[in-house]
């Protein structure tokens, strides 16, 4: 965890707070999208448990698409391309936006800005572990966006989740004293109001 915190702080240029990490089974394909819906400044780390290439579902990313001006151009372009749907003509949809194929082997970790456009094509079932870190909010507006984003992640992550069969990491908060790197992160979460959100204690 501390390695990811250090990397996130270096990439985002300041202190960070985490969202709940997730273990995810991806299947089929995912069209071009970003992972930010509220305007937060964050980075996502993804580790896949299979060897992935362009042929079997490796993550594809559009370099530079996290910059606002490039994001706006891509969004406008995608709207013009809407008649080309992934289910109607997969090859045409895949070719409609060029992307870098991040081929990976187990043990590799991909880090990308939440605003980066990414997709996956030709996918098989693939298991991944992901963790998101946000830049610690400094203004009331940033705090509001952070809380909405984290709340959304709780809703998606724990709605209908069988916590008895698949326990969450309930000792992360309680065991902070034994991990000096963790304590200041928890204090940032508490100060930002993250730990007051519904579901926060279940998630951590």
Regions found by a protein language model. Give the residues of each.
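Short histidine-centered beta-strand/loop micro-motifs
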Residues: 31-37, 103, 119-123
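Extracellular structured ligand-interaction cores
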Residues: 40-46, 56, 99-101, 117, ...
